[in-house]
C-alpha cells in the first residue's frame, strides 16, 4: 500500500497509537530480529569526523551512542533524560549544568562520566590545532562557542560555560546522540589515565595522540571489527559486522533504561541488494531517498513518501575549473531547477502551498517553513529558476572560458540523482558546458577537496543519505571557512561573520537582515546551488509496530529500540 503524506505529526501520532498495541503484545508474538536498511554506507563508529559525517554512522548508532538529546521527526532536538539532565544556570553568560544519570555506564562496565563531554568538546571545538586542526571534525557549530568545561575526571557532573556574547541558540542539540564517544577508550589508546587532564592542560603531545585515535580509531571495516573499541551507552550495542550478515546490533544488557522491545536489529547499509533482501524476508524497514533504487516487489509493505529537512543541492569546488565565481554561476544558470523540482522534487505527493517541497529551495541559510524564508528567498528573484542559456554563456565568457567540463560526484547507485545529472548534462551542453556523471559506490564528499570532482550532489555539506534538521545551523556552518564539511573550500569573511551571528540570535528582524545579506553574497559567489527539499521514502513491512518516519539526519532508526515485528 502506498500512502501519500505531507510534513505533519501524522506519523508520530500513528507511532504513538501503535505503541498502545505493542504494549498488549505478548513476547511470544514478537519476531526476535528486525532488518533495517538506509541509503548510506557504514564505515565509521564516529559520526563527527568528516568521513564519519558523510557515512551512515548517525543513522546506524543513534540508539547505540545516546546523548542528552536526540533528533525527533519534526527536526527538533528533544531531551533524552535516560542519560541525565541539563539545566541553564542563571547569569549573563550562557552556562549549562550537565548531570549524568548515576546508573549510566557503557556496555564494557565503564561508567559514563563528564570525561565524555570534555572529549566531545575538544574534538569538535576546533581549538586544538597546529598548522591544521588536530581533530578532523565535520563541524564546530556550537562547540566552538564553549569557553570551558568544569569536569573532575570520572565525575557525573559538568559545568559548560560559553564565551561572552556566544549564547548558542541550538544548545539543546549539543552532546546529543552520536556526539558522545567513550572517552575511556580514547584515553586507553593514547596511553593516559583520562582525557580530561591533558585537554585542560593543553598538552599538545597527548592531545595529538587522542586526536589520532578519535580521527581513525573508530573506522569500521566489515569482517574485521574489534568490538572492544565500540562500547555502547545505549539500548543497543554492536555485536558483529560482516558483509554476509550485515551490521548486527543486539540489546545492551548494561542499559539502565527501558529495555529495547526487540533483541536484535540487523542493519544493511548502502550497497546491499535491497530487492533481494526484501524477497528473502531479511528487511522490514527501509529508509531511502525517494526513487533512489528500484525496490522490486513491496507487497506486504506500507510506503510513505514525504519531504525531508535535507535540501538536495550541488556543492561546487572553488578550485580548478570552477575557481571563478562566474564559472560557478554559468553552471547554475544552465540548470533547470524548477523543472527538476517538478519531476523529481515531490514524487508521489502533491507539492504543498508552503514549506518543504512546495517549490525549489531559494535559501541556503533558512529552512523553507521559517517565517523569514519568503523574504530571504526573494533575494534570488527570477534568476536561476530555469535553464538560461544566454546567462550561462555570458557568465562562461566572463570566466575566461569558451567551454567547461564539470564532473558531478555522488554516492551510487542512485537512480534519482542519475536522472538529475543526466538532465543537467542535456540542458548545459547547449551552453558549452559538459556535465559528466562521476558517481561511484565508493564516492565520498572528500573527493571535492581532493579535486577529483568539480561538484557534489547531496545534502548540505555534500552529505549523502538522510540529512537536515529544523535548525539550519549545520547547513550554514558548511559554508564557513575551515569547517570540515566545507569540502568545496569556500571562504568569505562576511559569510563567516553572518553564520556566527545567526547561531546566537533569535531576533526575527536581525535574522532577516543577516540572512538576506548572506543570500545576496551567496547567490553572487555561488559556492552551492540549492535545488529542493529531498523527498524521503520509508517502507515498513506489515506487522511492524512503532516505526515512525523521521525525515531528518537521524533517519527512521531514531527510535529503533521501540520497534516490534509481530508474527
Regions found by a protein language model. Give the residues of each.
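Periplasmic-binding protein-like
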Residues: 322-372, 519-527
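N-terminal lobe/hinge region of extracytoplasmic solute-binding protein
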Residues: 37-91, 122
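Extracytoplasmic/peripheral linker and loop segments enriched in polar/acidic and small residues
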Residues: 341-344, 351-354, 380, 436-444, ...
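Ligand-site clamp/hinge motif
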Residues: 241-296
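Surface-exposed binding/hinge segments that line
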Residues: 137-215
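Long beta-strand-rich cores associated with HINT superfamily self-processing modules
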Residues: 540-567
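Gly/Pro-rich hinge or "lid" segments in bacterial periplasmic/extracellular proteins
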Residues: 179-257
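Structural transition elements
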Residues: 348-398, 412-417
Amino acid at each position: 500500500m502506498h500512502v501519500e503524506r505531507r510534513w505533519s505529526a501524522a506519523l508520530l501520532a500513528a507511532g504513538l497509537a501503535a505503541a498502545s498495541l505493542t504494549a498488549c503484545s505478548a513476547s511470544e508474538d514478537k519476531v526476535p530480529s528486525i532488518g533495517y536498511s538506509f541509503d548510506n554506507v557504514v564505515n565509521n563508529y564516529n559520526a563527527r569526523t568528516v568521513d564519519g559525517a558523510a557515512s551512515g554512522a548517525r543513522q546506524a548508532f543513534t540508539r547505540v551512542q545516546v546523548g542528552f538529546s536526540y533528533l525527533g521527526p519534526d527536526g527538533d532536538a528533544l531531551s533524552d533524560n535516560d542519560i541525565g539532565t541539563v539545566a541553564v544556570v542563571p547569569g549573563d553568560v550562557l552556562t549549562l549544568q550537565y548531570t549524568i544519570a548515576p546508573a549510566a555506564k557503557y556496555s564494557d562496565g565503564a561508567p559514563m562520566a563528564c570525561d565524555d563531554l570534555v572529549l566531545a568538546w575538544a574534538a569538535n571545538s576546533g581549538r586544538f590545532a597546529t598548522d591544521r586542526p588536530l581533530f578532523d571534525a565535520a563541524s564546530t557549530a556550537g562547540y566552538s562557542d564553549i569557553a570551558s568545561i568544569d569536569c573532575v575526571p570520572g565525575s557525573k557532573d559538568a559545568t559548560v560555560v560559553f564565551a561572552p556574547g556566544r549564547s548558542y541558540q541550538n544548545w539543546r542539540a549539543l552532546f546529543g546522540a552520536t556526539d558522545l564517544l567513550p572517552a575511556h577508550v580514547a584515553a586507553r589508546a593514547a596511553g593516559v589515565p583520562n582525557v580530561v587532564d591533558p585537554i585542560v592542560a593543553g598538552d599538545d603531545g597527548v592531545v595529538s595522540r587522542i586526536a589520532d585515535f578519535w580521527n581513525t580509531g573508530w573506522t569500521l571495516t566489515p569482517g574485521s571489527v574489534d568490538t572492544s573499541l565500540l562500547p555502547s551507552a545505549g539500548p543497543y550495542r554492536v555485536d558483529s559486522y560482516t558483509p554476509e550478515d550485515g551490521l548486527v546490533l543486539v540489546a545492551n544488557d548494561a542499559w539502565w533504561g527501558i529495555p529495547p522491545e526487540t533483541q536484535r536489529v540487523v542493519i544493511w547499509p548502502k550497497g546491499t541488494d535491497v530487492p533481494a533482501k526484501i524477497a528473502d524476508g531479511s528487511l522490514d524497514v527501509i529508509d531511502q531517498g525517494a526513487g533512489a533504487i528500484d525496490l522490486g516487489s513491496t507487497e506486504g509493505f506500507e510506503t510513505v513518501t514525504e519531504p525531508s529537512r535535507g535540501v538536495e543541492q550541488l556543492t561546487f569546488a572553488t578550485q580548478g575549473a570552477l575557481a571563478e565565481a562566474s564559472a560557478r554561476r554559468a553552471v547554475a544558470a544552465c540548470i533547470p531547477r524548477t523543472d527538476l523540482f517538478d519531476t523529481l522534487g515531490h514524487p508521489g505527493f502533491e507539492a504543498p502551498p508552503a514549506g518543504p517541497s512546495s517549490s525549489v529551495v531559494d535559501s541556503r541559510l533558512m529552512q523553507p517553513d521559517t517565517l523569514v524564508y519568503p523574504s530571504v528567498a526573494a533575494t534570488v528573484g527570477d534568476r536561476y529558476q530555469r535553464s538560461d542559456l544566454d546567462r550561462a554563456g555570458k557568465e562562461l565568457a566572463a570566466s575566461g572560458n569558451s567551454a567547461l567540463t564539470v564532473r558531478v560526484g555522488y554516492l551510487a547507485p542512485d537512480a534519482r540523482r542519475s536522472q538529475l545529472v543526466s538532465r543537467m548534462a542535456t540542458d548545459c551542453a547547449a551552453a558549452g558546458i559538459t556535465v559528466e556523471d562521476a558517481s561511484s559506490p565508493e564516492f565520498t564528499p572528500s573527493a571535492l577537496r581532493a579535486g577529483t570532482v568539480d561538484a557534489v550532489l547531496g545534502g548540505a555539506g555534500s552529505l549523502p543519505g538522510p540529512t537536515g534538521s529544523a535548525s539550519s545551523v549545520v547547513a550554514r556552518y558548511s559554508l564557513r571557512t575551515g569547517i570540515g564539511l566545507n569540502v568545496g573550500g569556500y571562504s568569505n569573511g562576511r559569510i563567516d561573520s553572518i553564520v556566527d551571528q545567526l547561531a546566537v540570535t533569535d531576533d526575527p528582524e536581525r535574522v532577516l537582515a543577516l540572512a538576506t545579506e548572506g543570500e545576496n553574497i551567496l547567490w553572487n559567489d555561488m559556492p552551492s546551488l540549492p535545488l529542493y527539499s529531498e523527498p524521503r521514502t520509508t517502507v515498513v513491512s506489515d506487522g511492524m509496530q512503532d516505526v515512525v518516519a523521521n525525515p531528518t539526519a537521524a533517519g527512521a532508526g531514531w527510535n529503533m529500540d521501540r520497534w516490534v515485528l509481530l508474527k
